[in-house]
From Swiss-Prot:
SMART domains: Ribosomal_L14. One of its GO terms (molecular function) is structural constituent of ribosome. It holds the Pfam family Ribosomal_L14. Binds to 23S rRNA. Forms part of two intersubunit bridges in the 70S ribosome. It comes from Cellvibrio japonicus (strain Ueda107). Gene3D superfamilies: Ribosomal protein L14. This is Large ribosomal subunit protein uL14. CDD domains: Ribosomal_uL14. Belongs to the universal ribosomal protein uL14 family.
Length: 122
């Protein structure tokens, strides 16, 4: 459950290390984002010579949350961190590698690229 001012780790090799959510996209009064939701983020920590710089404002998709994902069969999948993958304006991932597991809930037309790059899909 990600809201405005939440910090997230970056799960790709775009050059950012930590980002902060500044807006949850999808409605004027939408408060929380879960796995698979697109948010607007600002880069708070970045490595030198990366594709993105500190202070840049980008889109991101949430791939892991501490809150977890409830499945239809009643099981709950939780993670140790909140993580996101940075996107460009066309909703394609900026990085070329994904670190850590992602959930099956990302399957769909938009995020199949992230699923194919991920080392593990839960």
């Amino acid at each position: 459950m990600i809201q405005t001012e939440s910090y997230l780790d970056v799960a790709d090799n775009s050059g950012a290390r930590r980002v902060m959510c500044i807006k949850v996209l999808g409605g004027s009064h939408r408060r929380y984002a879960a796995v698979g939701d697109i948010i607007k983020v600002t880069v708070k920590e970045a490595i030198p010579r990366g594709k993105v710089k500190k202070g840049q404002v980008l889109k991101a998709v949430v791939v892991r949350t501490k809150k977890g994902v409830r499945r239809q069969d009643g099981s709950l999948i939780k993670f140790d961190d909140n993580a996101a993958v940075l996107l460009n304006n066309q909703d394609a991932p900026i990085g070329t590698r994904i670190f850590g597991p992602v959930t099956r809930e990302l399957r769909g037309e938009k995020f199949m690229k992230i699923i194919s790059l991920a080392p593990e899909v839960l």
